[in-house]
Amino acid sequence: MKGQETRGFQSEVKQLLHLMIHSLYSNKEIFLRELISNASDAADKLRFRALSQPDLYEGDGELRVRVSFDKDNRTLTIADNGIGMNREEVIDHLGTIAKSGTKAFLESMGSDQAKDSQLIGQFGVGFYSAFIVADKVTVRTRAAGDKPENGVFWESAGEGEYTVADITKADRGTEITLHLREGEDDFLNDWRVRSIISKYSDHIALPVEIEKREEKDGETVISWEKINKAQALWTRSKSEVNDDEYKEFYKHIAHDYSDPLTWSHNRVEGKQEYTSLLYIPSQAPWDMWNRDHKHGLKLYVQRVFIMDDAEQFMPNYLRFVRGLIDSNDLPLNVSREILQDSSVTRNLRTALTKRALQMLDKLAKDDAEKYQTFWKQFGLVLKEGPAEDPSNQEAIAKLLRFATTHTDSSAQTVSLEEYVSRMKEGQEKIYYITADSYAAAKSSPHLELLRKKGIEVLLLSDRIDEWMMSYLTEFDGKAFQSVAKADESLDKLADEVDESTKEAEKALEPFVERVKNLLGDRVKEVRLTHRLTDTPAIVTTDADEMSTQMAKLFAAAGQAAPEVKYIFELNPAHQLVKRAADTQDDAQFGEWVELLLDQALLAERGTLEDPNQFIRRMNQLLAS
């Protein structure tokens, strides 16, 4: 062999191999699915390239995968006649992992997590899965269109290094030979290999053939037997495809080891002709929040594979949806640029978005437990929807789930439809509060009057919630109202004030003026309130004023936010307010008012500009 060299694996590959061999061993047969899946992708790529360069077929357009074994040498070989690889591609694909964020992902995995095959599985280990059952892997490959002498040899024991060299290979494509570990002779059994291929690869459009050896006239005759249906699953009628086939096809296109939660398979004819097969995963990919995370659907045109990750067919808030679209209306030479400006794409995006939302709505109605799994994994992504897609806002709002004062649990399980069904007679608005945590929202003094009246409040504590609510203005004709903002509907909820209370409050007017004079422009307004039962004071904002949580979002993003001007509301029935009102000494009065304001700000913001001053003041007043 010419040009032979030994190279070290990228460190991430070594880590991944170690984790994978130990964590996926219990489900080791998946290596065959992964290698056949890769062969199918190689055939798809060749078909696509050959649209503009038919010579790449080299006179052999019958694409297939062939599986054979050699019992004497204990090897299993998977060979395809797809696109193949040149030397540079071999080093890129088999010596490194190109995914960004890989290192951080692997470092975050502790020894316990290493046992989690789902976590490793969703990484999409592909080729490296061969080392689960093999102690040495040999690859012989040649890129379509290259000369026979430009073949490439690659070999590794899956430890620290691999060997690469130049060889002569007459036919294009890739041949992977697994030298099986001791105890893995199961994979040299014809029936066993057939059953694995049938289980995992029936849906692949590429014929998968297994070697047959027969003795005739003292000679061994080799033939090849096709053992899968070799028809693209999405082109078959729904009634012909069973659940297991749909699940296996999902694992093939999504490179995920978990079953999907649900799917929707549809063929549309008429003005537009297309087939779609959409899936909702059961687990978020580990790099979903990585800016480089690829998402989108597989695109086929007239059953010819065009591209992976075509994100033009789904809005960003549905980026977790996996699957494919096969269109009859797009040109075969379509590019990402053409897709961007195509009216066909826009129409497909509208239709597929509606289909995905309907699929989620059906899941929510049919299986609340599965929908909760979806919500825990992807709820934060779906919450981007009301801002991003106003035309589907009502449909998205139906899918949102919240923690509320009704359930006494931090689990987000309550739909807006449920909330509306429990609204009190005369209640006009849907009440909510945003806070840094569920505990802070639940114990907020803003809820006191609503609790007393038995009115349910949505408790929002995800970082995105305040931003979402600035776009989500109503549901089922009912407006949303933050309980931290001043509003007439909240004032109406308070009990009727009797004459003696009115007189007592009139007597407090000089006190309110005194507080205003003391605080000056540090607050927007000072007033008495009937919204409180146990708390002496709160701060609220006007309807058009920026909220506390929104100001925090700006600050977290490093942006300057206008200073929030609060309304300082005092509970005239509370003993501390009465005590402050009765204090004649100006210095002592100032300390009481500052303490009440600090308490209200602490409850609202969770922090104070000067906590030491607050502690000093508290200690002083407790001791007096």
Swiss-Prot record:
Presence of keyword RNA-binding: no
Region (B): 337-552
Region C, annotated ranges: 553-624
Keyword RNA-binding recorded: no
One GO term describing the cellular component: cytoplasm
Cysteines joined through disulfide linkages: none
Record Pfam families: HATPase_c_3, HSP90
Keywords: ATP-binding, Chaperone, Cytoplasm, Nucleotide-binding, Stress response
GO MF term list: ATP binding; ATP hydrolysis activity; ATP-dependent protein folding chaperone; unfolded protein binding
Cellular location(s): Cytoplasm
Family that this chain belongs to: Belongs to the heat shock protein 90 family.
Function: Molecular chaperone. Has ATPase activity.
Oligomer status and interactors: Homodimer.
Record-given protein name: Chaperone protein HtpG
Originating organism: Klebsiella pneumoniae subsp. pneumoniae (strain ATCC 700721 / MGH 78578)
